[in-house]
C-alpha cells in the first residue's frame, strides 16, 4: 500500500492558485430489485488501515461507481453511504476487517442506489446508534430495505437539521447542508464537515452546482483539507465558486473503472488542478485511507498510480483563466482574494468574473482593483 505524509499547505497558497483559475461550466443509477446480500465472513484482503497509528482515519472504500466512506476516531465509527446493493457484502467485509462491532452513526447521503444500496446489508449485520437520511421514504426497493433494516434494530431513520453537531471520539462532525429544498435528488445530499484537530474533511455526496452555490452563500465554513469530490467527479458538481470556498489540498473521487458516465470529467479534473488540489481516485488506486494526527495526515492506497494518470488534464489549459472576486454583502463592493480589506467570511459572496459581480449590483474596491 502506498504510504506518505502530507504536510498542510497554507490557505493563501491555495487561494492564490485558484484565483487565477478558469470559471468552468457547471448518471443516475436506478435501484435494483436484488435481495440484501447476506453478511459474509472476512475473506478478502483489506487495506492495511489497522496498522496505522493515527487515532483518526477516513476510508474511501473501493465500491466502483458508487460511494462509501468509513470514518473512525478513538474507537468510534461512522459510515457515510454504502455503495450499490451489490457492494453490500464487500462493505460488510471491509468493516469486519477493521474490527468494527458497532456503528455510532450511519448516514445515507441521498436516496440513490449507488449511495443507499449497500446500507441494508450493513444494518443487517452491525448495530447502529443512529441512522440518518435527508428523507424517510422513497419509491425504490433499495431504500425500503434500508428503512426496513433500520427499523429491525428498533431505530427510525432520522432527518437531521443543518447545524447539528455530533461527536465521534475527539472528532467533530457538523451538518452543513442541504440549506434549501430541492427537487433534484442529488442536491438533497447531506453535507458533512469533519474536524479532527486542525485537519478538516468535507463529505458532499452527489451535491451539484445549484446546492453548492446556495451552500457557499449560506456562509458555512467550507474550507477543508480533504474534499470528497461530488457526484463521482461529474462536471455537474465541483463548481468553480464552490471549490474556491473549499480550497482543498486533496480531492478524492469515488468512481468505477471505465464507467459509462465518463467520470471523472475533464472539466472537474481541470478545476482541481487549477486549485492545486492533489487528486486521488478509487478507480485507479482502490481503497484510499487518510490518517490524521490532528496536524498533518498520511495517505495510503491499495494500488499505485502516477500523477499523470490521476489527473491527465493539461496544465497549460489554465492559461486562459478568469479572475475570481469576493463580494461584501453589506457594502456591496467586490474585492480580489488578496485584498487586505476582505469582509468577514459570513459576509462574503463569491463571483467568478468581474461582469458577474457588476451585474449583481456590486462595485469594485478602489484599494485592490485599479480601473
What are these regions (language model features)?
Residues 9-34:
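Sec-dependent N-terminal signal peptides of Gram-positive bacterial secreted proteins and lipoproteins
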Residues 328-344:
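Short aromatic-glycine-(Arg/Gly/Cys) micro-motifs in beta-strand/loop hairpins
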Residues 24, 332, 358-361:
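Residue-level signal for mature regions of secreted extracellular proteins and peptides
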Residues 316-332:
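SH3-family beta-barrel domains
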Residues 2-6, 28-321, 341, 347, ...:
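Non-globular, low-confidence helical/coil segments that flank catalytic cores
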Residues 290, 322, 355-359:
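Hydrophilic extracytoplasmic domains
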Residues 340-371:
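Compact, charge-rich alpha-helical regulatory domains located at protein termini
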Residues 126, 334, 351-352:
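A broad, structural micro-motif
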Amino acid at each position: 500500500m502506498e504510504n506518505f505524509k502530507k504536510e498542510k499547505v497554507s490557505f493563501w497558497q491555495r487561494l492564490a492558485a485558484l484565483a487565477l483559475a478558469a470559471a468552468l461550466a457547471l448518471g443516475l443509477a436506478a435501484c435494483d430489485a436484488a435481495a440484501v446480500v447476506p453478511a459474509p465472513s472476512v475473506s478478502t484482503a483489506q487495506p492495511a488501515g489497522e496498522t496505522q497509528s493515527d487515532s483518526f482515519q477516513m476510508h474511501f472504500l473501493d465500491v466502483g461507481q458508487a460511494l462509501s466512506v468509513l470514518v473512525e476516531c478513538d474507537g468510534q465509527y461512522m459510515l457515510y453511504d454504502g455503495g450499490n446493493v451489490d457492494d453490500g457484502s464487500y462493505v460488510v467485509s471491509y468493516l469486519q476487517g477493521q474490527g468494527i462491532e458497532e456503528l455510532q452513526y450511519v448516514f445515507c447521503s441521498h436516496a440513490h442506489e449507488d449511495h443507499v444500496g449497500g446500507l441494508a446489508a450493513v444494518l443487517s449485520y452491525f448495530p447502529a446508534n443512529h441512522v440518518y437520511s435527508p428523507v424517510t421514504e422513497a419509491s425504490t426497493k433499495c431504500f425500503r430495505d434500508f428503512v426496513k433494516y433500520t427499523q429491525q434494530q428498533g431505530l427510525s431513520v432520522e432527518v437531521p437539521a443543518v447545524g447539528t453537531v455530533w461527536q465521534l471520539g475527539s472528532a467533530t462532525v457538523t451538518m452543513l447542508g442541504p440549506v434549501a429544498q430541492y427537487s433534484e435528488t442529488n442536491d438533497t445530499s447531506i453535507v458533512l464537515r469533519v474536524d479532527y484537530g486542525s485537519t478538516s474533511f468535507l463529505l458532499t455526496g452527489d451535491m451539484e452546482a445549484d446546492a453548492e452555490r446556495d451552500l457557499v452563500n449560506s456562509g458555512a465554513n467550507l474550507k477543508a483539507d480533504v474534499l470528497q469530490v461530488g457526484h463521482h467527479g461529474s462536471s455537474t458538481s465541483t463548481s468553480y465558486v464552490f471549490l474556491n470556498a473549499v480550497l482543498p489540498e486533496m480531492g478524492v473521487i469515488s468512481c468505477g473503472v471505465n464507467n459509462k458516465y465518463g467520470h471523472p470529467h475533464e472539466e472537474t479534473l481541470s478545476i482541481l488542478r487549477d486549485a492545486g488540489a492533489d487528486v486521488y481516485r478509487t478507480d485507479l488506486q482502490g481503497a484510499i485511507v487518510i490518517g490524521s494526527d490532528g496536524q498533518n495526515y498520511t495517505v495510503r492506497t491499495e494500488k499505485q498510480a502516477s500523477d499523470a494518470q490521476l489527473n491527465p488534464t493539461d496544465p497549460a489549459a489554465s492559461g486562459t483563466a478568469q479572475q475570481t472576486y469576493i463580494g461584501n454583502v453589506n457594502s456591496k463592493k467586490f474585492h480580489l482574494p488578496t485584498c487586505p480589506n476582505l469582509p468577514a467570511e459570513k459576509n462574503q459572496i463569491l463571483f467568478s468574473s468581474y461582469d458577474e459581480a457588476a451585474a449583481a449590483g456590486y462595485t469594485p474596491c478602489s484599494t485592490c482593483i485599479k480601473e
